[in-house]
A protein has these predicted regions:
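AAA+/SF3 P-loop NTPase mechanochemical coupling elements
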Residues: 182, 226-243
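DNA transaction DNA-binding modules
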Residues: 4-7, 80-84, 197, 209, ...
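Alpha-helical scaffold elements adjacent to nucleotide-binding pockets in ATP/GTP-utilizing enzyme cores
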Residues: 154-157, 209-217, 238, 254-258
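Segments of Walker-type
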Residues: 1-116, 249
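P-loop NTPase catalytic core of nucleic-acid-dependent motor ATPases
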Residues: 73-178, 183, 316-317, 324-327, ...
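Conserved nucleotide-sensing/catalytic segment adjacent to the nucleotide-binding pocket
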Residues: 178-229
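Residue-level preference for the first positions of well-ordered beta-strands
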Residues: 138-142, 188, 240
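Phosphate-sensing "switch" segment of ASCE/P-loop ATPases
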Residues: 234-237, 248, 252-356
Length: 498
């Protein structure tokens, strides 16, 4: 009985000297009075109850009255039942301060983001991810982080900040397993090693099911799932998802409108490590309970700020519609980490100006650019590295043997890096065969499985080469200056091996 409701609740309904028999009688008496609705059963997380916020911490529920966080019943007069489960972090009496919120932003900014506001956007995502059940539309983030970027440290630090408020999985986890673990809750979900999706057809199907779950979670859509007992089961996902991988598996336009895609560059020297360590040390005093207390106190303010930011972002053609709404939630979350009030118009202008100059609008990427990115981020057959990484090995290998091994791998998929006659280091070219069978297999399950050569010809910097020898065979294909793909390869041409 205590798992259904607290002892105080039963006492309120049945009097001081109630017995189990009294409770059973009360339950029988309630039968038929209300129709069961899955939406009335809520798991752990933040929730909106009329205009109030409810935080179900599993073993207890909390709300805010007169500006203070207090404990409340898990059975509401509105008919909502907040399920009991494992205990999540309780909100602490003293919430996280503005300075501590800035420390989170500073730590995330210590990573080498390709995007101008990468650290700020990730910090805002974490804030809105905590309140995912309280808001109507949820953003998701996909971080592309190759080896040497500090991804392992990032994931570890995020887990420490969130405690068991977040659910953590690896790419090998099934959609059903994730769905069952989420249950009726609204916890933030971390999914690492999503590059496993590129290994085989079965893995790709598994990740596609996970992506379907993420799509439904964006707006909290209800799914009807069959069971062995032939009884349909309703499931409603209301979590925000953070996915991490080496490459990017976002293909559908529907997915790109729901995700903010961020990229981390490799570390550059000892100084970057020291900067990150210093920033990490400042997180030591931030507990999950302090972070949750701040988000509870500011959830309603965040919703107001999100609407204000969204209105301004919607004026920008590339950010209109759903994208403006999701970015509004994220930026409002980032603002709430360091400010407790309503955002001002000049502060919104600072955000929107940065959005206009950033590289967040993945939908503006052309089909040819997406095709090239798919090739560079795919894994070489028989090797754990991506095509882009093998190209880097060829250009920057520490030894002639390493560069020769890289050349053999590239030859096998019809790709060659060469310097035209009379050219200098900065004029190196990338040749991609339009006829290679292994490259065709890599692109088999994409939109370009039989036409990648024609598609790549549409790149502004590309030209067609009717004959190029690769591994003693003649090939037709596309030639692209290495300089034109350096943003995808993410390396400094000034350090190129001669």
């Amino acid at each position: 009985l205590i798992t259904l409701a607290s002892e105080a609740w039963w006492t309120e309904k049945l009097g001081e000297k109630w017995t189990v028999t009294d409770a059973a009688g009360y339950c029988f008496g309630q039968q038929g009075r209300k129709h069961y609705s899955p939406d009335k059963i809520r798991g752990v997380g933040f929730w909106k109850e009329k205009s109030a916020i409810i935080y179900n911490a599993g073993d207890r529920c909390f709300t805010i009255e007169s500006g203070k966080i207090i404990e409340t019943s898990n059975i509401r007069e509105e008919g909502t039942i907040y399920q009991r489960s494992e205990s999540l972090p309780h909100p602490e009496t003293i919430p996280m301060s503005d300075e501590e919120g800035q420390a989170i932003i500073d730590y995330l900014n210590s990573f080498a983001w390709r995007e101008e506001m990468g650290g700020l956007l990730l910090s805002g995502f974490l804030a809105q991810g905590i309140t995912a059940g309280f808001i109507d539309t949820r953003a998701h983030v996909w971080i592309n982080a190759p080896a040497g970027t500090g991804k392992t440290f990032l994931v570890s630090r995020l887990k420490e900040l969130l405690g068991n408020y977040s659910l953590s999985f690896t790419g090998g986890t099934s959609e059903a397993g994730i769905r069952q673990k989420i249950g009726s809750g609204a916890r933030l979900v971390l999914l690492d090693e999503m590059e496993a999706a590129n290994q085989d057809k079965y893995s790709k199907q598994k990740v596609e099911k996970i992506m379907s779950l993420v799509r439904r979670a964006t707006d909290g859509e209800t799914s009807i799932i069959g069971s062995k007992e032939s009884v349909p089961i309703e499931f409603r996902a209301r979590s925000s998802f953070l996915l991490l991988s080496i490459g990017n598996s976002l293909q559908r336009t529907a997915d790109k409108s729901r995700f903010i895609n961020l990229h981390v560059r490799p570390n550059k020297g000892l100084e970057s490590f020291e900067k990150r360590d210093d920033a990490a040390n400042k997180l030591a005093g931030i507990s999950p309970g302090k972070l949750i207390a701040r988000m509870m106190s500011l959830a309603s303010v965040m919703a107001t700020n999100a609407n204000l930011i969204q209105q301004k972002l919607s004026a920008h053609p590339a950010l209109a519609g759903r994208r403006a709404e999701l970015l509004g939630n994220i930026l409002a979350g980032a603002y709430a980490l360091t400010h407790a009030g309503i955002i001002s118009e000049p502060e919104i202008d600072i955000y929107t100006a940065a959005m206009n100059t950033g590289s967040l609008d993945e939908n503006q990427e052309t089909d040819a650019e997406r095709c090239l990115r798919e090739i560079l981020e795919s894994r070489v057959v028989g090797n754990s590295e991506t095509v882009g990484q093998v190209i880097l090995n060829y250009l920057h290998g520490d030894s002639s043997i390493e560069r020769q091994d890289a050349k053999k791998l590239l030859d096998g998929i019809g790709i060659s890096v060469y310097r035209p006659q009379g050219g200098n280091g900065s004029s190196q070219m990338l040749f991609i065969s339009a006829q290679n069978r292994q490259l065709s297999n890599i692109l088999r399950d994409t939109d370009w499985g039989n036409c990648w050569g024609d598609v790549l010809r549409n790149l502004p910097e590309a030209s067609w080469l009717s004959e190029k020898r690769v591994r003693n065979s003649k090939h037709k294909g596309v030639v692209i200056p290495i300089e034109a793909v350096k943003s995808l390869l993410e390396f400094d041409l000034s350090t190129e091996s001669q």
